Amino acid sequence: LYFLRNSRDIRGYGVEIDDSNVLACFNNGVNVIQSDLESGLQSFESDSFDYVVLSQTLQAVKHTEGIVKEMLRVSKEAIVSFPNFGYWKNRFQVMLGHMPVSETLPYQWFDTPNIHNCTLGDFEQFCCQHGARILERRIMSRSRQVTFLPNLFGMLAFYRFERQK
């Protein structure tokens, strides 16, 4: 939000529960509401924003369906990013009998906040089943866009989507 405000003159709000992160937002002049993300969007009216962005958090929320529904209620479009559990190195670690640990999944199985890992196919199926139309998809691996077998070679997924009309 700090970058968007300074580079694009965008007015935005963050939802953050951690005290130190809320303080950092205030110190940087970023608008923030201290709340749990699971209930933080409820305080906004429908269609309050052009976009809602959820960056590398979708896999860590308890109620994925509720969050996506709320994102699409309060905005025209939503943008999410998440680590691709289908990335080949993640698959290989599972094949060897271990939960994946990588740049995008940096936690051990016992201390991870990630409770809903998904692949590109899983997320796209979720969108179809929950009335979300995908507008754009970018799959990245080490700052490069992946177009060949993205579910296998992409580390990080970015999706822009809207409510079905």
Where are these regions (language model features)?
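Class I SAM-dependent methyltransferase SAM/SAH-binding core
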Residues: 1-40
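S-adenosyl-L-methionine-dependent methyltransferase catalytic module, highlighting the catalytic core
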Residues: 65-70, 77-165
